[in-house]
């Protein structure tokens, strides 16, 4: 398999031997024979070597993955050292605490790819789906306390290899809090599952005890910002797409939006007084607010499983069979189409960096993947910049849309220091309903929950409430009325002829927009489980409830549709909306052509009057009249 000869199970006692055996198991169980062949070719045709040891250093890794580093003067990203330190840590799995940073041998890279592409589920029955603890450890700056340790007799083989393999794993800092008390015991499941069949539990637990007794860790803001900027740039990446297509054209304007979104996301992570991000803050924020943040790493490292040197459709000359081909003369693979479809307007809010930010926490409409991973497209429905600030235009464009929608709002908040720009939004997976003028509050089993969010100046996510107790007609996710405007996450008052009541905020979050679409109020509370939206996962009960008044600059609604390139037997929401508009136009023309002064008993007159009565345009013989939007 390209791995060195394994140690017998009964003789395996050291972390090095057990780590080697686990790599063998990963290689045979988690990759197909073809993937393993491509993997070996990619690794060994590029590997540096000293003696019998073949390994990758930082430059080889960055060049292969096309990740910019400090040596690339043309690219403002500098993520190469960050990715290398992550890989050097993960390559020592499950003994990161004693073996990391590891030399990137083939065995180490096998474990890295399995962990970062989440293929470990094929081998590890008890593996948790998330990789949060491993990713935290790979990013954290680690400082060792001054304690008595046995001397290390001689340097290991890994220490003799090119020092560049570990040079960029920068030393960290120590903090004053107790050591790693935030690592819950159940977070060891991934490593324990990896070793339970290798009779190595005690070895691992010893390694874990060393970690908890010796190390203190925080992720530095500078390190995390560099990784976030890379993830924002490559988030649309699909398997086998060239990474350089996303990293080679980063002009000043693009980098400005990337930095803005990276800072907005960073603001969501509570920071320690001593500096950096603790494990507790990191894990809680990722789990509750940014569940898809690290998804781009999967297609990035899947590049290792396809070698351009192995063109199985053509015979190759043996003389160049071992030469790595980083640059190919073949036609490059086409990039994924933009998630934004052309339509009646171009967005004044969305840009590639904001779309990437959205993909870090918004699911597709079926809830199984993130926004960019399910052939989902955004169709422009309504924009105040294009359609005006009219509720009539809003209802014509939005209430006729038979699919989920994404609402985005950009505006300014008046503060003592001046105006501050804010960007809010709502993910509404169910279509708006014209009968009740509200979005359906009943969710199908396969649908995702709605959510309310803030993108800037600080990332904030108010998740949808899964409780069936709030799925009532008077608590819809979204509500529209000509009298009160647009309401999200509010309680709808009962109809009254004597007074006009407005929807009231309910639960942990709500957004109300006035009838002129010029101002909005954003309510956020750290409590309240009786509404459509729940408190943010990072909020504390000691936080204060806030009400933010916003002057709206832009309001946009985008509809969710499948990729037009994917054939489907069902009509798309775009076709259904066009058919509804055509029907409304025909009915309007028919109404204009009605002659209600026709002779008594005329069937045409009776049909015309019935049509007008049904539409609520005129009253019936009993004096009733009116209608709903």
UniProtKB/Swiss-Prot annotation:
Provenance organism: Aspergillus oryzae (strain ATCC 42149 / RIB 40)
Compartments, record wording: Cytoplasm
Gene Ontology cellular component terms for the protein in this record: cytoplasm
InterPro entries named in the record: TLDc_dom (IPR006571)
Record domain TLDc: where: 348-561
Keywords, sorted A to Z: Cytoplasm
Annotated family: Belongs to the RTC5 family.
Start and end residues of each stretch annotated as Disordered: 147-181, 315-334
UniProt function note: May be involved in a process influencing telomere capping.
Tree of life domain: Eukaryota
Extent of Polar residues compositional bias: 322-331
Name of the protein in its database record: Restriction of telomere capping protein 5
PROSITE patterns from the UniProt entry: TLDC
């Amino acid at each position: 398999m390209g791995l060195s000869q394994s140690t017998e199970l009964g003789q395996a006692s050291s972390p090095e031997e057990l780590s080697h055996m686990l790599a063998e198991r990963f290689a045979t169980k988690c990759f197909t024979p073809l993937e393993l062949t491509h993997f070996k070719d990619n690794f060994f045709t590029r590997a540096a070597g000293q003696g019998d040891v073949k390994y990758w250093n930082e430059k080889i890794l960055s060049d292969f993955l096309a990740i910019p580093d400090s040596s690339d003067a043309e690219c403002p990203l500098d993520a190469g050292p960050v990715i290398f330190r992550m890989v050097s840590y993960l390559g020592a799995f499950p003994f990161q605490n004693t073996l990391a940073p590891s030399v990137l041998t083939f065995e180490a890279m096998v474990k890295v790819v399995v962990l970062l592409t989440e293929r470990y589920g094929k081998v590890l029955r008890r593996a948790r789906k998330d990789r949060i603890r491993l990713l935290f450890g790979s990013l954290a700056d680690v400082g060792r306390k001054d304690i008595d340790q046995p001397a290390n007799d001689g340097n290991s083989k890994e220490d003799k290899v090119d020092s560049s393999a570990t040079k960029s794993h920068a030393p960290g800092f120590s903090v004053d809090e107790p050591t790693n008390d935030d690592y819950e015991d159940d977070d060891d499941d991934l490593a324990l599952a990896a070793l339970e069949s290798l009779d190595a539990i005690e070895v691992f637990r010893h390694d874990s005890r060393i970690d908890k007794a010796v190390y203190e860790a925080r992720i530095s803001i500078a390190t995390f910002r560099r990784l976030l900027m890379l993830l924002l740039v490559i988030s649309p990446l699909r398997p086998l797409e060239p990474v350089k297509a996303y990293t080679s054209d980063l002009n000043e304007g693009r980098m400005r939006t990337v930095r803005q979104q990276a800072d907005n996301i960073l603001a969501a992570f509570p920071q320690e007084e001593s500096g950096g991000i603790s494990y507790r803050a990191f894990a809680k924020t990722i789990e509750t607010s940014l569940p898809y943040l690290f998804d781009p790493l999967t297609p990035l490292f899947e590049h290792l499983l396809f070698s351009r040197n192995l063109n199985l459709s053509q015979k190759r000359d043996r003389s160049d069979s071992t030469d790595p081909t980083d640059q190919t003369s073949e036609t490059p693979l086409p990039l994924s189409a933009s998630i934004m479809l052309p339509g009646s307007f171009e967005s004044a809010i969305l840009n590639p960096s904001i779309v990437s930010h959205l993909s870090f926490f918004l699911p597709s409409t079926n809830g199984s993947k993130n926004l960019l991973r399910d052939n989902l497209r955004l169709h422009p429905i309504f924009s105040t910049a294009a359609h005006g600030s009219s509720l009539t235009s809003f209802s014509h464009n939005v209430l006729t849309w038979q699919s989920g929608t994404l609402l985005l709002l950009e505006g300014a908040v008046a503060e003592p220091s001046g105006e501050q720009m804010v960007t809010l939004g709502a993910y509404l997976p169910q279509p708006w309903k014209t009968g009740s003028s509200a979005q359906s509050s009943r969710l199908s089993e396969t649908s995702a929950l709605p959510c309310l969010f803030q993108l800037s100046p600080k990332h904030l996510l108010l998740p949808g409430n899964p409780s069936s107790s709030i799925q009532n007609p008077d608590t819809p996710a979204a509500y529209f009325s000509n009298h009160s405007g647009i309401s999200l996450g509010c309680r709808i008052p009962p109809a009254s002829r004597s007074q006009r009541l407005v929807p009231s905020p309910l639960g942990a979050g709500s957004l109300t927009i006035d009838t002129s679409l010029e101002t909005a109020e954003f309510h956020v509370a750290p409590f309240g489980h009786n509404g459509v939206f729940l408190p943010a996962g990072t909020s504390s009960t000691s936080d204060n409830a806030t009400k933010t008044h916003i002057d709206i600059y832009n309001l946009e609604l985008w509809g969710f549709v499948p990729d037009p390139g994917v054939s489907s037997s069902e009509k798309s929401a775009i076709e259904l909306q066009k058919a509804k508009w055509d029907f409304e136009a025909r009915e309007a023309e028919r109404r204009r052509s009605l002659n209600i002064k026709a002779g008594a008993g005329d069937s045409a007159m009776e049909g015309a009057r019935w049509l007008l009565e049904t539409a609520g345009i005129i009253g019936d013989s009993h004096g009733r009249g009116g209608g709903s939007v």
